Amino acid sequence: MVRGRISRLSVRDVRFPTSLGGHGADAMHTDPDYSAAYVVIETDAEDGIKGCGITFTLGKGTEVVVCAVNALAHHVLNKDLKDIVGDFRGFYRQLTSDGQLRWIGPEKGVVHLATAAVLNAVWDLWAKQEGKPVWKLLVDMDPRMLVSCIDFRYITDVLTEEDALEILQKGQIGKKEREKQMLAQGYPAYTTSCAWLGYSDDTLKQLCAQALKDGWTRFKVKVGADLQDDMRRCQIIRDMIGPEKTLMMDANQRWDVPEAVEWMSKLAKFKPLWIEEPTSPDDILGHATISKALVPLGIGIATGEQCHNRVIFKQLLQAKALQFLQIDSCRLGSVNENLSVLLMAKKFEIPVCPHAGGVGLCELVQHLIIFDYISVSASLENRVCEYVDHLHEHFKYPVMIQRASYMPPKDPGYSTEMKEESVKKHQYPDGEVWKKLLPAQEN
């Protein structure tokens, strides 16, 4: 039962020094320190339940997101949770349409990352109070209630409330069977853990061999910095995994449009399923041009992890600019905005293959993609969710992978709650880890 008035909101800057091991390095982000703005909301319900939310960053700039969260806090404090979820669309619009803050958005950039962190905490709180994981909260929700959580502004030319309701009502058919299937088998995943650009060939081989031993059949490799290096590394991985297993590539926005086509034409020999983020995430027509050139080579376009909002996704779908749509649980406006994108993808029959990894992204997005299969897409064809084996030990309810699949979480909430000792240790700049590292970095 939903209860309580939100009485406190706190936010902390939490950073993990992943750059020291080359973890997460790609063609554009060469030395990331995986980080998060970590939000905790409390109520006056005196039940001890807290809502925890995060948004993912790469180190520097996390303090800016923290500042934006604090700027949004007045929209949340002293609100009854019952009133928020009773008019979630209205609350979402209140957060995203602040008459002054929207000028540094609107619905994009730092202020939208902050919005995601706050809303993720609200969803975590709601699900915990209901005693359900978020995916189950969504699956059990009446289609009309789900629709009421979505802001359809700017997308009604593609998806109306009536369209969304029709999709969700159709999704009720066979829902119980699909839920049983997920609980038994899990949602298929692929691994990005073995092929970061910061890794040596020996490390790549070692991690790839271990992934094969662990049962992984789908692998992603980072490309885009140096063509000859890409050719060598892709050859290593393809030789190790064999011709039957799936290989994906990710350029992390490195190329201009003609360069993307030329580069991928040379990497086509390694038979990638897709090239991810081949160019600027804002260049819808550029993606469409690349798609038109590469689809005849059997290479699809995947993008979305840095798409600002539902409008960019709408245009990518309209322009036939992608074959695989990658939602992000912290880039878009939390569950609310992701619902609209899942529904648009269903309408266009484009498979959703979420971006994950980072700090807590796997923990969050598993809820969305499991809900998508059970209640929206009803298909696993060409669908797979990213998995990166980093930093899960810092979460109270970490993801569970079995047989290279995400097993549906059973603990109440959004799986966003971090261990307090981890937060204190990695808080920037005064946590134990950074008190040791910062003086050394300055010398």
Swiss-Prot record:
What the entry lists under PANTHER family is as follows: ENOLASE SUPERFAMILY, MANDELATE RACEMASE (PTHR13794), MITOCHONDRIAL ENOLASE SUPERFAMILY MEMBER 1 (PTHR13794:SF58)
Phosphoserine, modified sites: S148
Indicate what this protein is called per its UniProt record: Mitochondrial enolase superfamily member 1
* Residue sites binding substrate per the record: G24, A25, D26, Y34, K220, N252, E276, E305, H355, A356, G357, E386
Q: Which reaction does this enzyme catalyse, per its entry?
A: L-fuconate = 2-dehydro-3-deoxy-L-fuconate + H2O
InterPro entries cross-referenced by the UniProt entry: Enolase-like_C_sf, Enolase-like_N, Enolase_C-like, L-fuconate_dehydratase, Mandel_Rmase/mucon_lact_enz_CS, Mandelate_racemase_C, Mandelate_racemase_N_dom, RHMD-like
Q: What Enzyme Commission number(s) appear in the record? A: 4.2.1.68
Entry annotated with the keyword Magnesium: yes
What is the active site of this protein?
K222 (proton donor/acceptor), H355
Indicate the principal place this protein occupies in or around the cell. Answer: mitochondrion
**Molecular functions per Gene Ontology:** hydro-lyase activity; isomerase activity; L-fuconate dehydratase activity; magnesium ion binding
Subcellular location(s): the record lists: Mitochondrion
Give the SMART domains listed for this entry. Answer: MR_MLE (SM00922)
Q: Name one GO cellular component term.
A: mitochondrion
This protein's UniProt keywords: Dyskeratosis congenita, Isomerase, Lyase, Magnesium, Metal-binding, Mitochondrion, Phosphoprotein, Ubl conjugation
Give me the disulphide-bonded residues. none
Q: Which gene encodes it?
A: ENOSF1
Q: What does this protein do?
A: Plays a role in the catabolism of L-fucose, a sugar that is part of the carbohydrates that are attached to cellular glycoproteins. Catalyzes the dehydration of L-fuconate to 2-keto-3-deoxy-L-fuconate by the abstraction of the 2-proton to generate an enediolate intermediate that is stabilized by the magnesium ion.
Maturation and modification: Could be sumoylated.
Which disorder is it connected to?
Dyskeratosis congenita, digenic: A form of dyskeratosis congenita, a rare multisystem disorder caused by defective telomere maintenance. It is characterized by progressive bone marrow failure, and the clinical triad of reticulated skin hyperpigmentation, nail dystrophy, and mucosal leukoplakia. Common but variable features include premature graying, aplastic anemia, low platelets, osteoporosis, pulmonary fibrosis, and liver fibrosis among others. Early mortality is often associated with bone marrow failure, infections, fatal pulmonary complications, or malignancy.
Which cofactors, if any, are listed as required?
Mg(2+)
Enzyme class, UniProt record, top EC level: lyase
The record's cofactor note says: Binds 1 Mg(2+) ion per subunit.
Q: Where does Mg(2+) bind?
A: D250, E276, E305
- Please tell me the species this chain comes from: Homo sapiens
Record family assignment? Belongs to the mandelate racemase/muconate lactonizing enzyme family. ENOSF1 subfamily.
Some GO term, biological process aspect, for this entry: which one? amino acid catabolic process
